Amino acid sequence: MSFKKAQSHFFLKNPERVRSLQKLSKKIGIKFSKVEYYNTAFIHSSYKNENQEILEDNERLEFLGDSVLGLVAARSLFRKYPKANEGELSRIKSRIVSTPILNSISEKLELSEYLLLGKGEKNSLGKGRRKLSANLFESLVGAIYLDQGFEIAEKFILRHLSEFVENPEKEESVRDYKTQLQEYSQKHFKILPIYRTKSESGPDHAKTFQVVVRIRDQWEASGSGVSKKSAEQNAAKELYNRIRKKT
């Protein structure tokens, strides 16, 4: 059985899957011609390994989508910044196609809702969730490119990426520093960061929180914000950047 027929066979046996991808089609404003591409775009390798009827996962589409995404970003930056040199363009490009930004777009589109993931992977998935989410956007781009061509794929990408092309510094606002600090701490120190609310001031409608984050007795930083969550993010950002500079 060919790849296309096998994937279509699996797809047609699952009416819920059909409805799910129809929902995706409406959400992204693209009428699918070859639905099997989009189905495959959301098949994780762990799901393929647990289901013998699945012959292809989304890794090839992810590879293709990454290349299409890179080309679209490069073309846009080349036009937007005519005086920027190669090094400057490369630095901006790496920021706007980074995991935090692609993850934020993927979350906005709720792409994980369409993901077919193996049972074992569901249980073990933790720190790689952001990367997995970003990869889904790339595999979707790969599917759109194969199904609709470069022009439609480019329009889709720019619909979601143009704000970062216009303002690359906006990448900073989508970074989840708590997650990054946690991942770094687990990898290098084998321990989780500890957060403590140091102070809480101001009236109920305009409170300011001061939070301290610590990794062992070796590293510590503080941050403030209008909520505990934002204060923790700011403290995590301060400590993460400090550690990365010194290690």
From Swiss-Prot:
Gene3D superfamilies: 3.30.160.20, Ribonuclease III domain. InterPro entries: dsRBD_dom, RNase_III, RNase_III_dom, RNase_III_sf. The lineage of its organism: Bacteria, Pseudomonadati, Spirochaetota, Spirochaetia, Leptospirales. The active site is at D66, E138. The keyword RNA-binding applies. Residues 21-149 form the RNase III domain. The keyword Hydrolase applies. Its main location: cytoplasm. One of its GO terms (molecular function) is metal ion binding. GO terms for cellular component: cytosol. NCBIfam families: RNaseIII (TIGR02191). Digests double-stranded RNA. Involved in the processing of primary rRNA transcript to yield the immediate precursors to the large and small rRNAs (23S and 16S). Processes some mRNAs, and tRNAs when they are encoded in the rRNA operon. Processes pre-crRNA and tracrRNA of type II CRISPR loci if present in the organism. It comes from Leptospira interrogans serogroup Icterohaemorrhagiae serovar Lai (strain 56601). It is an enzyme of class 3 (hydrolase). Homodimer. This is Ribonuclease 3. It comes from the Bacteria. Its EC number is 3.1.26.3. Its cofactor is Mg(2+). SUPFAM superfamilies: dsRNA-binding domain-like, RNase III domain-like. Keywords: Cytoplasm, Endonuclease, Hydrolase, Magnesium, Metal-binding, mRNA processing, Nuclease, RNA-binding, rRNA processing, rRNA-binding, tRNA processing. Belongs to the ribonuclease III family. Mg(2+) binds at E62, N135, E138.
